[in-house]
Amino acid sequence: MIAYVEGRVAEISGNACVVVTEGGVGYEVHLPAHTLSRLPERGGQVAFHVRTEVREDALELFGFSTWDERQTFMVLTTISKVGARTALAILSQFRPDDLRRLVVEDDVLALTRVSGIGKKTAQHIFLELKYKLKVEDLPAGLVLAGGAAPGGVFRDALAGLGNLGYLEDEAAPVLKEVLKAEPDLDVAGALRAALKALARGR
């Protein structure tokens, strides 16, 4: 069973890329949208944690940038009515910590943002995730008072602060307080508010 692939990008087609190893073997690897969007040009080096899915008529590889994402994919595929393609679509919309946040917040309808998932299917998947997804793995820095997590806004705003030269240990607590006070902020708003707070603290 193939669990890891490293090599250069030979082709990109649809939601997959062909990775050619040093030994000259090419593997077609299906990827989440956010990973696909960050692929280097042809010839660039890549490495993926891989899950091999075997069907009667095909053997498919699904690649992920982190081991956590691969394990979350495996959890999703154990849910009835969720095949590998649906699991990949879910992980194209939500990172593992985003899914944990949905469980913490009891946000069932968020799953309907995934193409092909209606309200009834979302409820079924959500009930399974409650029992199968390790919510305790949600980083403490991503959890607000009352258990809610800022998810993508927190992550993207924190990355923006890092690009501006702020250390994570300095920026994360301030950003957490900003989102605790104003949970509806978008990334730009969270950045502006955090920068003001950081400027006052210096």
Curated annotation (Swiss-Prot):
Its main location: cytoplasm. It comes from Nitratidesulfovibrio vulgaris (strain DSM 19637 / Miyazaki F) (Desulfovibrio vulgaris). The gene is ruvA. Residues 66-144 are annotated as: Domain II. Homotetramer. Forms an RuvA(8)-RuvB(12)-Holliday junction (HJ) complex. HJ DNA is sandwiched between 2 RuvA tetramers; dsDNA enters through RuvA and exits via RuvB. An RuvB hexamer assembles on each DNA strand where it exits the tetramer. Each RuvB hexamer is contacted by two RuvA subunits (via domain III) on 2 adjacent RuvB subunits; this complex drives branch migration. In the full resolvosome a probable DNA-RuvA(4)-RuvB(12)-RuvC(2) complex forms which resolves the HJ. This is Holliday junction branch migration complex subunit RuvA. Residues 145-155 are annotated as: Flexible linker. The keyword DNA repair applies. GO terms for cellular component: cytoplasm; Holliday junction helicase complex; Holliday junction resolvase complex. Keywords: Cytoplasm, DNA damage, DNA recombination, DNA repair, DNA-binding.
